[in-house]
Amino acid sequence: MNRNLHHIITTIITVFISVTLYAAHTNAERLSLLQPLIQYDLAFNTGVTTDSIILWEKLLTPELEKQQRYDILFQLKAMAVQSSITEGNISLAIDNANSMYKKAKEIDYPLGTALALRAIGNTYLSSSTPQVAIGSYEEAIEIMQQIPEADIYLKNALSQMILIKLNNRQMAGIEKDINYLEALCDKRPDSPCYFYLPCCRAFYEIQSDKLPSALEHLQKMERIYAKHPYPYFLLLIKYLYASYHIAAKEYTQALQSYDELLPYVKESGSYKDIQISQERAKVL
């Protein structure tokens, strides 16, 4: 089972869905389209392509720096790094993540440093060095824990780290990590970010071969998605259902989950569609 799931978490973090390019002519329009991503620290949203994010980061940076809107600036820079990863331009992503880290240090902005470390972790993950990626996430989490307004980023970074550890069978201390995530999520149970808790629990139960419990958490994910229909959530649901069906030896259903997912991935232009197709082929 683990071979079939080897790249799932990497793909979850790096693939974007983007189906429509909006013609945003002003920075205000661009920020408006990016608002759902900024507000909930989401990896992507329909209507904003990876190319748009990379371009808009360049266009918006001077104005955001002038206004000292570092909270938006560094999140946008992190999005641009992620977009480069999604397009397969890992070297550019690494350069931009390191530049982001240097900038945050220069202006002494801890949240920017934490977001840069998380972005660096994403580049390591895409370079198939998960252990180094985990180290970057741990550094980011340590900084975020000291920043009250970093709560949403802390949940995201922690859930990413948990998923990577699970994918690499690093089970030591994983329950402690999940319990910590639960304590964070319980502060705002109505927030869309609560989605990440059943997501991590579902994958943990799949890896632990506790499939009935895994299914319950998958169903919780679906209920949250019904209230907060963000495309990123749907992507995670499809991936984890595929892994659930593989673990349950329900290969027809696993293929169906992949088939429902692939059109979105191909439409996004992500280089990951080939990888997902290869994983699907292993199920045949």
Q: What function would you assign to each model-found segment?
A:
Residues M1-H7:
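Positively charged n-region of N-terminal signal peptides that target proteins for export
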Residues I8-I9, Q219:
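Compositionally biased, intrinsically disordered low-complexity segments enriched
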Residues L21-L284:
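A "functional boundary" signal
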Residues I9-T20:
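Bacterial N-terminal signal peptides
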